[in-house]
Amino acid sequence: MTEEPYFYHPLENIEDIEVFEDAMERKRLTPKLNEARPYVYFTLEYYDKDNGIRGGGGLGVLAADTRRVAERMQLPFVTVTPFYPVEMHQRLAACEELGGGQSLLDSEATQNVAVSVAPIDEERRVNYADFGFSYVDSVFIKCCGNLCKLDVIEKRFKTTRILAITEPNFGSLYQGLSGSDHRLYQEVALGFGGYQALKLVSLRPAIIQLNEVATFFAALARLDELCKNGMDFYEAMVYVRKHTLYTNHTLVQAAEAEFSHEQFERFVYPNVRSKAVRRWLDGQFTDSEIRLSSVATLLAELKNGVSKLHAAKANYQDANGERVKFKAVTNGIDVFKWVAPQILTFYQKCGIIDSIGCVSANYREALENLTAEKIRELKHGGREIMNQILENYPDQNGKILEFNTDDFVFDFKRRFVDYKRPELAFQDPARLRGVLEPYGAHYILTGRIHAGDENMVQKLQQILAAVERDDYLKTHVHYLADYDEKLAFGLSCGCNTAINVPIVGLEACGTSWEKDVANLQLLISTADGGVADLPREYHLDVTGSSDAEEAESLYARMGEALEIWGNDFDLEYRIGTQLEGFLPIISGARMVKDYLDMTGLTATK
């Protein structure tokens, strides 16, 4: 009988261990990145509309910014993420869609919280081929007794690439509740499927950065392969730990969902081939439940929080009960993506930032060119950008907004979750009116509500009811339903003052405020997240020991912002102070450099 011909397949590559002995001895990684051994960034959230992936909020935007910054820095860098075949959009429901017969905000209905209005999610299918992705091959994972096929697709740039896994039923980001079967399936598919995808294209990571705990299974897949192919478990653990960076964005471990051992039996263990890894993982359960962060910290020697306050306050324990120490690497943004073109040109011409987005050595002196007259001129250009974008975003009354250059506009734009407090400005509607009306000022409110978050739906209903009851607020407070990166950009460019009021101690970093500061908005904020990297004098600080006190502080700060914009000296001083303090923090290139310094990696030319 003739022997079947042998066909080599890239998946037969195993993780090489040629540098293992060296890795055992040194504290830092191989100091060079190259095309075959790139920096690899796993993320379940990735928000990059230009490339067809609309997955997530701030964390997803951060992931996309990180790749763009790496491209500008000419780093060999690979983002591994799902390509979601479905993207979600949100709009305000018309009353008849909810089964009611009253007007959208009927005057009698507004006396009751249960007004006939709520955000509705709409699905839109997305085809990866429409965004320049090409099909590579398929890989398989095992779940619930089934062999699940995942298509591997990629899009290459000069030095970076997006390597994605996808399948028609993958769903949208975070489809299902935390701890649900579908959520676990998505995480397992990204981890085990994404690791196979790297092998498929013959890439061997110099470092794997886990962008939040949902990507834990990538490190587990690497550990499993090393053990399955003959490496001693403890040696493999050392190797994986020295080549893994875990980035945490959540302050309180108790807020993280748990998965059961029974779920792992169906979704995880069918993909684990090493008995040693299986035995180790079994030992990490407590009362048949597991939090992925407790094991992610064991697989990553390098761990960071995303602001100074977050790194200091994050309350995490590993599976051994030991307090986890995080290094601070504050999130940054891609200034070339998020700063209005005319402002960016000014920064570059004056020598405030360099070609990759880092501040120059003499940026403080260069900021002296930013006069009040120049600020107003640049913001007028930003207002034009905002008005063009707003043509596609009607407010709660179906009105298309257009603002004059002299109109004063506050904005609150961020994901609608309880701790970010979109309702704080509406604690006292009469007081809010008293702040806005003398200046004819407007207030824009926008942010996505997660499906099933009835608490935030109710808070939105309360806000809209309060707005409708007041004849000034109903024409000057505007809720925009379908919050996305385009709208976020427009508002950052064109609004005067940004409002950022998370409960202190609950915001890991936040990046919306960074975009606002870079676009010459005044920042009103509590001292939380990345804002707290600097003392309180660098922003208009909201304080208080209760919501009522903080609301009153917010109103006072809003009044102060209105006065500042009317005084050239104060405007120049305040905007200059913000930029002097925050520009180095805001820089995404600074953030990437911090990660390279943390890992000891540099790029070969």
Where are these regions (language model features)?
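Catalytic cores of carbohydrate-active enzymes across secretory and cytosolic contexts
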Residues: 1-605
